Curated annotation (Swiss-Prot):
Record's GO cellular component terms: mitochondrion
Protein's name in the database: Elongation factor Ts, mitochondrial
Presence of the UniProt keyword Mitochondrion in the record: yes
HAMAP family hit by this protein: EF_Ts (MF_00050)
GO biological process: mitochondrial translational elongation
Swiss-Prot/TrEMBL keywords: Elongation factor, Mitochondrion, Protein biosynthesis
One GO MF term attached to the UniProt entry: translation elongation factor activity
Other comment: This protein may be expected to contain an N-terminal transit peptide but none has been predicted.
InterPro entries for the chain: EF-Ts_dimer_sf (IPR036402), Transl_elong_EFTs/EF1B (IPR001816), Transl_elong_EFTs/EF1B_dimer (IPR014039), Transl_elong_Ts_CS (IPR018101), UBA-like_sf (IPR009060)
Family: Belongs to the EF-Ts family.
Function: Associates with the EF-Tu.GDP complex and induces the exchange of GDP to GTP. It remains bound to the aminoacyl-tRNA.EF-Tu.GTP complex up to the GTP hydrolysis stage on the ribosome.
Species per Swiss-Prot/TrEMBL record: Danio rerio (Zebrafish)
Protein's UniProt keywords contain Coiled coil: no
Record gene name: tsfm
Alphabetical list of PROSITE patterns matching this protein: EF_TS_2
Amino acid sequence: MAMYSLFRSVRSEVVKGCLTQHVQSLFTSCPSLAADKALLLQLRKSTGYTFVNCKKALEKCNNDITQAESWLHEQAKKEGWSKATKLEGRKAKEGLIGLMMHDNAAVMVEVNCETDFVARNEKFQQLVKDVALSVMAHQSTSKKTGFIKSVLSSEDMSKLNAPDGPSLADQLALTIGRLGENIAMRRAVSLSVPSDWHIGSYIHGTVAGQVGIEMGRYGSLVVFQGEPKEGTYALGRKLAQHVMGEAPVSLGNMDDLSCGDSETRLLPQTFLPDPKYTVAQYLTLQDARVLDFIRFQCGESSSQE
């Protein structure tokens, strides 16, 4: 009996000691656990990747957040290229037109995806902005003067550098990996005009979200010359709205006679903002003339591709 009591006493002390050590261990390990959690939250916020992948990155990089972020981007790029290859045959007819103006220059791009849901995603819209910025930067390196119009294909754009360093092709693959849809940089046009020329622009079906760029389902640019009575901005916007609504396919001449509703030449068409006049008549009133125009509709077939 005495032996049994002694055994119970010893056992109680052992259990108490183990519990004390366990509690002390928990308290001493809490600071490091908190630090890991803080790093995890920081990495998740800065990259947008899943908690699982962020945790894996921190473990692989010994909690070095800079290395972990680089590792995540590299893995995402690899996975994006792999996914892009698998998805490239799928139809991508949704997306956005991006339009950017700067001084006497303008850029309009079309980036396609599979669904309207992805087109409204912030990461997709950031890609559209990056493509427009890259095309604008590429255009600014030209040493040509006067009126410059450049049409870029998907292949042309893939060779450009993205604003933050990597190629646009890598940026595209990264976005495909994140969003899981086929995405394509379809086409772009850049314009640069002399100081006495002007560019009018219009975006229809506007989508808000990014600063410094207009986005929507349709976009138009009009190059014109003159000092209109109503001001260059007002006339430029009206002309671009007309091009958007009437979809002309050629410019025509100032003295062309209209063929009515079936007219596809810009100048003889009835002027959409003021139907009392043809486009040519309205330009004459404003002492201006149109030199060129471009119209993009998201998902349309195009001879410019």
